Amino acid sequence: VIQEIFGVNGHIRSVADGYAAQGYSVIAPQLYDRSAPDIELGYTQEDVQKGRDIRVELGFDKPLLDLQAAVSLLKSEGLAVGIVGYCYGGALAWRSAAKLEGLSATVGYYGSAATFKDEAPQCPVLLHYGEKDAMIPSTDGAMLVDLYPNRVEAFVYPADHGFNCDQRASYDGPSAALALERSLFFFQDYLG
């Protein structure tokens, strides 16, 4: 499970616990430990800015080292490995699908995957977008499906950015439930 810009906070731990309850072995790497060890941010404007600052400092390359280590650990246990990421983690999920060894499936929620559209995914990818999202255009999904029709599926929900996070005002329960259902079916198909 790949974090948003807020670090591995209560929401991400809850997501990880949810996948574990479905029978998956789960790792939620603390990607910000390279810059701000053990940081856990909330959803205030101050925390949003702090998270963005750390994301800018780390970029989109350094976290791939930690994600590869997590994937390799799970692969060493004989497991098929999938990644799910949210926002910043959604973009990292896309990059992981293109760059990491050992992935069988990737899911990204409202991430800026289109920024890295020239990096072709090496495993199946499922993307979730909110049509009311002012930060990440929901049309990105269709564009990525057009570029990689045999690798990418995308869905758009009547929701805003962060619709999966039940700790934010943008939470949309029905959209979150449907996206999770689709993600679980997707992982079942590719991970078992």
Annotate the PLM regions.
Residues V1-G192:
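N-terminal cap/leader regions of alpha/beta-hydrolase-fold enzymes
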